[in-house]
Amino acid sequence: MIRTLAAAAFTVLLAGAAPAAPLDGQQTYDLLFRNGTLDAISRDAALVYRRDVTNTIKPETGDRDTGAIALTFREGQDATLAKLEFRKDGKYRVLGSFPASVGNPMIMYFYEAVVRDMAESAGGSPFYIRNRVKEALIQPSEVEPGTAMVDGRSVETRTIRMHPFADDPNRDRMQGFGDLELRVTVSEEVPGWYLSLVAEADGGAVYRSELAFDRLDPSQ
């Protein structure tokens, strides 16, 4: 079982000697939506993530949306499916099922949750917000090499930062979400690829959503 350390479930230490490497749009997408990231995971196992949310515009949503997200497997009609469940206080809510062969759907859940949260908090069209976020996922970026402590050992990581509304003409009307940063940290040594997926508005002062790898349970 692997558990990340520190209060936020993981600690990323950027390696100062290694500069950020530029990626074109396709390379950014391929790193974020990497294929085959579930292939080595036993179909009897469960990947468990922790979602922590703070929202100063709608404080009540923080408690509502904070909890565990579990990824388990089930056999579909034509293929194995990865099922996502929100778990809190002994209650389970299915979030969706996705073909396991494609990769880890946690990133899709992450950005859809951010789109929903932003639309609910700041107003505006969720379709407009989603389109800006999706565009950010295929833009050129820089990947930051680093390390993280996982289960008491140091592992190599890569982090991509995205700012969907940096040049948006409406950003000043977004109640702090105009400064939204999406930050995805991945590692070959973390089951399921994603170590953390973080969204921060106004540096976290307005809104923060962190989805962090917690553990691999050998059985569901």
Language-model regions, residue ranges each:
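Bacterial N-terminal signal peptides
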Residues: 7-15
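Bacterial N-terminal signal peptides that target proteins for export
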Residues: 1-6
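Surface-exposed, glycine/proline- and aromatic-rich loop segments on solvent-exposed faces
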Residues: 92-117
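Acidic, serine/threonine-rich low-complexity disordered tracts
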Residues: 21-100, 121-220
